[in-house]
UniProtKB/Swiss-Prot annotation:
Source species of the chain: Pseudothermotoga lettingae (strain ATCC BAA-301 / DSM 14385 / NBRC 107922 / TMO) (Thermotoga lettingae)
The UniProt record lists the keyword Aminoacyl-tRNA synthetase: yes
Highest taxon of source: Bacteria
Name of this protein: Glutamate--tRNA ligase 1
Top-level taxonomy: Bacteria, Thermotogati, Thermotogota, Thermotogae, Thermotogales
A GO MF term: ATP binding
Main subcellular location of this protein, as a coarse class: cytoplasm
Assembly and binders: Monomer.
Protein's gene: gltX1
Enzyme category, top tier: ligase
Motif 'HIGH' region in this chain: 8-18
NCBIfam families according to UniProt: gltX_bact
Short motif ('KMSKS' region): ranges: 250-254
Reactions it catalyzes: tRNA(Glu) + L-glutamate + ATP = L-glutamyl-tRNA(Glu) + AMP + diphosphate
Protein function: Catalyzes the attachment of glutamate to tRNA(Glu) in a two-step reaction: glutamate is first activated by ATP to form Glu-AMP and then transferred to the acceptor end of tRNA(Glu).
Length: 470
């Protein structure tokens, strides 16, 4: 069975790149009828926070990426938090020592840093091996460690050989002999390093495939060596392309919202975000762009992942979000907009009226947040000043008087007031309606004017005309 994992560190909010990685793993697992596992890599004690872990889970659920095993629901291969697996890492580090494939290092951190600086000063890459650390493994130093209650770090003895990696996305990647020296797998405080914990966890959790960002490619040689040391078969690994901003530079905050939390707050729908992320480095075989989660699951395959960097285009995301807003019914949009209406202090007259407003403006929305400036005039009278031609002004004030005494408030009756007055006053219909739109909304464009007039109602329309032109 296919088993994949998404293994974030709870040190911040879920970024666009991380969310895409989670999505690709999810789509791959579901396409093959496999399992999607959530593992929390929280061994960075100083930066890991519970609030970020909670947000990661809520964000994944908001995106619809529900896991089959994880820290909250458990599973057959737990625990699913690395901080709860420290005894496991220690056990497997000792196994490598017993196999003479790892060794204890009694050098203090500052001594290791001194070695590093000396190598750099000689123009050498800081590669370590046993011989460098042997001078520190004296009886005196070991006794000193014991007296202080310290534990030695454990380093892996990197084989002096080349490694070949057959990447699911990039093809054959070769790591030359000596490209990596010995490296720490367990720190003196008992915390594992990333590559060691990753290999032990993937091995014990029976992960079959790993899809991750290409920034992890340099880690692959260390991980392949560790699998070999454990006589274990590594999972099949694929490295997906980097996400760049529209300017071709690595995606960052200067390109706008880059965390999923920010996108959610700005009124993007989860279906649109997921759909757009899927197209960052992957394409459907039928070139379809708007797809449901199920459609993406059915179409997804690793061989359609691109080797080239993907461009994150906020304008394309907004366009796609607009498509999803237009396909969402008014009842759902009403529920989605409720917290925003409270935030903006927009008080609807009643539920039916609000839904009619939503129908009038939804084609103009790219995000839910757009509702604030597209539909604000329905809730708040615009504060404007305008110089209006005398005849137009007279015609509009006459309309206001007629609207106040109107018996019926249906669309046809209201429109007839304007038509008859325009004809009687012999004014330009185009100029009249343009002025009316501005007087009622404070804008020169927007929803259909007939919808605006009907939703505001004859009394409100008359009041706005008189307050500005009277």
């Amino acid at each position: 069975m296919v088993r994949v994992r998404f293994a974030p560190s709870p040190t911040g909010y879920l970024h666009v790149g991380g969310a895409r990685t989670a999505l690709f793993n999810y789509l791959f697992a579901k396409h093959h009828g496999g399992k999607f596992i959530l593992r929390i890599e929280d061994t960075d004690i100083a930066r890991s926070e519970g609030i970020f872990e909670e947000n990661l889970m809520k964000t994944l659920q908001w995106l619809g990426l529900n896991w089959d095993e994880g820290p909250d629901i458990g599973g057959s291969f737990g625990p699913y938090r690395q901080s709860e697996r420290l005894n496991i890492y220690e056990e497997y580090a000792k196994k490598l020592i017993a196999l003479d494939k790892a060794y204890e290092v009694f050098a203090y951190p500052e001594e290791i840093e001194e070695i590093r600086e000396k190598l750099l000063s000689k123009g050498l890459t800081p590669h370590y091996d046993r011989t460098i650390f042997e001078p520190f493994a004296t009886k005196e130093r070991k006794r000193e460690y014991e007296e202080k209650g310290l534990k030695p770090a454990i380093y892996f003895s990197m084989p002096r050989k080349a490694f070949i990696h057959n990447d699911l996305v990039k093809g054959t990647v070769q790591f030359s002999e000596g490209s990596v020296g010995d490296f720490a797998i367990l720190r003196s405080n008992g915390i594992p390093t990333y590559n060691f914990a990753c290999v032990v966890d993937d091995m014990l959790m029976q992960i079959t495939h790993v899809i991750r960002g290409d920034d992890h490619l340099p880690n692959t040689v260390k991980q392949l060596a560790l699998y070999e040391a454990f006589s274990a078969r590594p999972p099949e690994i694929g490295h997906v392309s980097t996400i760049l901003g529209p300017d071709g530079k690595k995606l960052s905050k200067r390109h706008g919202a880059t965390s999923i939390e920010e996108l959610r707050e700005r009124g993007y729908l989860p279906q649109a975000v997921v759909n757009y992320l899927a197209l960052l480095g992957w394409s459907s075989p039928d070139a379809k762009e708007i797809m449901s989660m199920q459609e993406m699951i059915e179409r997804f395959s690793i061989d359609r992942l691109s080797k080239n960097p993907a461009i994150f285009d906020p304008a394309k995301l907004s366009w796609m979000n607009g498509q999803y807003i237009r396909s969402t019914n008014e009842e759902e949009l009403e529920q989605l907009l409720k917290p925003l209406l409270e935030k903006w202090n927009f008080i609807p007259r009643n539920q039916d009226w609000l839904r009619r407003v939503i129908i009038a403006v939804k084609d103009r929305l790219h995000t839910l947040e757009d509702f604030q400036h597209v539909a604000d005039f329905f809730f708040v009278k615009p504060e404007i000043k305008t110089e209006t031609e005398y005849q137009i002004k007279c015609a509009m004030l006459e309309c206001a008087d007629k609207l106040e005494s109107l018996d019926r408030s249906d669309k046809n009756s209201i429109v007839e007031v304007f038509r008859s007055t325009i004809k009687k006053q012999k004014v330009s219909a185009k100029e009249f309606y343009s002025t009316l739109r501005y007087v009622l909304t404070g804008k020169h464009e927007g929803p259909e004017l007939v919808d605006i007039v009907f939703l505001l109602g004859p009394n409100e329309v008359a009041a706005r005309i008189k307050s500005i032109l009277g």
